[in-house]
Design a protein with these regions (language model features):
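Conserved donor-nucleotide/metal-binding helix-loop-beta segment in metal-dependent transferases, i.e.
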Residues: 109-138
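Alpha-helical elements of Rossmann-like donor-binding domains used by nucleotide-donor carbohydrate transfer enzymes
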Residues: 49, 83-87, 113, 196-197, ...
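Conserved N-terminal catalytic core of the sugar/cofactor nucleotidyltransferase
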Residues: 1, 15, 19-100
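A short, conserved beta-strand element in the Rossmann-like catalytic core
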Residues: 105-108, 216
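Short acidic-glycine loop/turn motifs at beta-strand connectors
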Residues: 144-150
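Catalytic-core segments of class I nucleotidyltransferases/pyrophosphorylases
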Residues: 115-119, 150-218, 222-234
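Short alpha-helical oligomerization interface
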Residues: 7-12
Length: 234
């Protein structure tokens, strides 16, 4: 079972085809965008796994990878995704635009399209896809857009969704918006779900959403993992 599979091993490093989920994401960005610096944030339990991955990766690909151990070991003590982002920004004094993503999602299209979209719009951006199942809508972030892809509403796990566009954990943040994380946390922004900051930010400043041109596979359990492996082995 994937719980057992990932109890002592991080999901982003599970193999899909000939390489890990994280390799698929990182290699795509290096090959198709001008992104050349990566930061992996991990809990203490898995930090060494990512350090080992980094050592092997840097033997074959010449780009900068930093692994940050957030020092937490349990669900009860974890910082939450938004505070993890804040930790990285403060620790590394980051003052650039950021692409933030969860490492356990596989895409069948290039993220370069999303990066180009964000540059063109010159706002912080999210990705979205149609989700027509109510139960799934209630477990994710749901947005509505106008005809220029501007976000008009953004709700985390809504009981009564206003639309059917779901937001997966991929975000392009402008540097000026990244500076507002502390302000967000002080003003009611949730810190656990990765999309909480984007939801808060969308009410403060214009944000756009890129409608995904392909599929995203979330590795949630053993069935979804086996399915993704079968898709990528074709």
């Amino acid at each position: 079972y994937i719980v057992m599979l990932t109890e002592n091993f991080p999901k982003p490093l599970l193999k899909v085809g000939e390489k890990s989920i994280l390799d698929w994401l990182v290699d795509d960005l290096v090959d198709t965008t001008d992104i050349d610096e990566f930061v992996v944030i991990s809990n203490h339990k898995f930090a060494q796994h990512f350090e080992d991955w980094k050592s092997n990766k840097q033997k074959t690909r010449p780009y900068e990878i930093t692994v940050i151990d957030d020092g937490t070991s349990t669900n009860e003590t974890r910082l939450g995704a938004v505070k993890d982002i804040q930790l990285v920004v403060e620790k590394l004094n980051l003052a650039d635009d950021l692409l933030v993503m969860a490492g356990d999602n596989v895409l069948d299209f290039s993220l370069s399209k999303f990066v180009d979209f964000a540059k063109e719009k010159n706002t912080s951006c999210v990705m979205c896809h149609e989700e027509n199942e109510l139960k799934k809508q209630q477990k994710t972030a749901i947005i509505t857009l106008d005809n220029s892809d501007l976000i008009t509403s953004y709700e985390e796990k809504p009981k009564e969704p206003k639309g059917n566009l779901a937001v997966p954990p991929f975000y392009c943040y402008r540097a000026c918006d990244v500076k507002r994380i502390q302000e967000a946390l002080e003003n009611g922004c949730g810190y656990d779900a990765p999309g909480s900051f984007a939801a808060w930010l969308s009410k403060q400043t214009p944000m756009h959403a890129y409608v995904m041109p392909g599929k995203r596979y979330d590795i949630g359990d053993i069935n979804s993992y086996e399915y993704v492996k079968s898709v990528f082995s074709k």
